[in-house]
Amino acid sequence: MEYASWHWIFLINIPVGIIGAIATLMLMPNYTMQTRRFDLSGFLLLAVGMAVLTLALDGSKGTGLSPLAIAGLVAVGVVALVLYLLHARNNNRALFSLKLFRTRTFSLGLAGGFAGRIGSGMLPFMTPVFLQIGLGFSPFHAGLMMIPMVLGSMGMKRIVVQVVNHFGYRRVLVATTLGLSLVTLLFMTTALLGWYYVLPFVLFLQGMVNSTRFSSMNTLTLKDLPDNLASSGNSLLSMIMQLSMSIGVTIAGLLLGLFGSQHVSVDSGTTKPSLCTPGLAWRLSSPFRRSSLPECQTIRIKTWLFRVEKGARNEVLAARYYRQTVSGDFRHLHCLADQYALGGAYQF
């Protein structure tokens, strides 16, 4: 975003995908199975059901749809999924056979993975947003901060089998689920304390824990499936993974829109819309800081107006960041303010 347009966020996937396809052709063995007729009817029912339900989740915040239209989308999605269940019942050529759910570990693993990935799917989206808006990182540096998370995730792939064989699925899943919560809280704490040099190590640890959790969950989900259902079960698992992560990003966007529209008070006595969540979090974290701001201290935000790039749908006025020095430590207070609240003094 600093050096090119936003389109390159997606275009960069093209060469990566080509390299991945070539590597697959060169390295992966070509296993063959008996082919069967493609279940076009089941595919269309599933595609329609998941697409309209995901669109309905975005709601009026992202799409501008009326409540009646959203209710209609939900109804269409539910009907499409129910029709697929009726279609797949006693149908040996169904896209995803209902016989898959007779395997208890598959059903439990699929449900647990779906719920778990809704939360974990928010992390790759919310972490850069927090680094940029909450801590004032540039888009480039926020992107660099994600590299330790990827390295931690990739590094655990080599040893996760040994970890699961030694401790067992139950202990690994319980420990990694609790560990992911603790690491996420550790990330917030270190960020609010201003220990930015610790953040790469915390993100590396987060990648390790997350990778161990879902690698063990995926193998538990598929390990008891019979050979004739293994391919279908793996495809259904991949579909549920993508759907749950999409839902996670959608929910994260809804939460950002909800809390971003909250109001804060300025010294004029009026209430103006603004996004000042980091300031609130800073106040709430005062018992854990080595030094804190004086009670009820007023910090006057210095603003620097700028307009977004030409061609944007709406011109947006915003405030850049002001660095306040307290007891020799640099404390960041970040507010994304609109034209109504600029120049105000925020109390917290």
UniProtKB/Swiss-Prot annotation:
Source species of the chain: Shigella dysenteriae serotype 1 (strain Sd197)
Upper taxonomic lineage: Bacteria, Pseudomonadati, Pseudomonadota, Gammaproteobacteria, Enterobacterales
Protein name: Putative multidrug resistance protein MdtD
Keywords of the record: Cell inner membrane, Cell membrane, Membrane, Transmembrane, Transmembrane helix, Transport
GO cellular component: plasma membrane
Transmembrane segments: 8-28, 40-60, 68-88, 106-126, 129-149, 185-205, 239-259
Domain of life of the source: Bacteria
GO MF term (any one): transmembrane transporter activity
The keyword Transport is assigned to this record: yes
